[in-house]
């Protein structure tokens, strides 16, 4: 399966409206769906946040110029929320998956499908 198919499948669930897969270092976009693109400083703060969430804790995270309040940050997952919409960022061995969900979707529903994709990729050494 191509990387594009993974982001398209996330959108196809109806639980996510935008998704992007970056290299683990955040220096290359491998696939994007729904028009999600991040500025270099935005992906940079997310990639750094997996190892040291202090910056995200004090400043939030930014996706397409929008500030999201940090809900969770550890070495695998970063969750953020802005009003009723949110983002789920998950790091695997070789990728960073970032997905945005709209106000009509519950956070837990979006989180579950993104984390499941990450589990699959980790299981196949990605």
From Swiss-Prot:
Matches recorded under Pfam families: Profilin
Molecular function in Gene Ontology: actin monomer binding; phosphatidylinositol-4,5-bisphosphate binding; proline-rich region binding; protein sequestering activity
Compartments it resides in: Cytoplasm, Cytoskeleton
Single GO cellular component term: cytosol
Assigned keywords, A-Z: Actin-binding, Cytoplasm, Cytoskeleton
CDD domains, A to Z: PROF
UniProt main location, coarse: cytoplasm
GO terms for biological process, alphabetical: intracellular transport; mitotic actomyosin contractile ring assembly; positive regulation of formin-nucleated actin cable assembly
Residues of the signal peptide: none
Superkingdom of the source species: Eukaryota
Family: Belongs to the profilin family.
Subunit structure: Occurs in many kinds of cells as a complex with monomeric actin in a 1:1 ratio.
PANTHER family assigned: PROFILIN (PTHR11604:SF0)
Function per UniProt: Binds to actin and affects the structure of the cytoskeleton. At high concentrations, profilin prevents the polymerization of actin, whereas it enhances it at low concentrations. By binding to PIP2, it inhibits the formation of IP3 and DG.
Name of the protein this chain belongs to: Profilin
Source organism: Saccharomyces cerevisiae (strain ATCC 204508 / S288c) (Baker's yeast)
Native organism taxonomy: Eukaryota, Fungi, Dikarya, Ascomycota, Saccharomycotina
Name of the gene: PFY1
């Amino acid at each position: 399966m191509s990387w594009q198919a993974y982001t398209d499948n996330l959108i196809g669930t109806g639980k996510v409206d935008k998704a992007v897969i970056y290299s683990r270092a955040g220096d290359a976009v491998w696939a994007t769906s729904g028009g999600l693109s991040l500025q270099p400083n935005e992906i940079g703060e997310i990639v750094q946040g997996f190892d040291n969430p202090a910056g995200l804790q004090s400043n939030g995270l930014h996706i397409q110029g929008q500030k999201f309040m940090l809900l969770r940050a550890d070495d695998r997952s970063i969750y953020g929320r802005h009003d009723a919409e949110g983002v789920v960022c998950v790091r695997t061995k070789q990728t960073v998956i970032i997905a945005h969900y709209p106000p009509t979707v519950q956070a837990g529903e979006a989180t579950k499908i993104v984390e499941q994709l990450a589990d699959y990729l980790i299981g196949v050494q990605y």
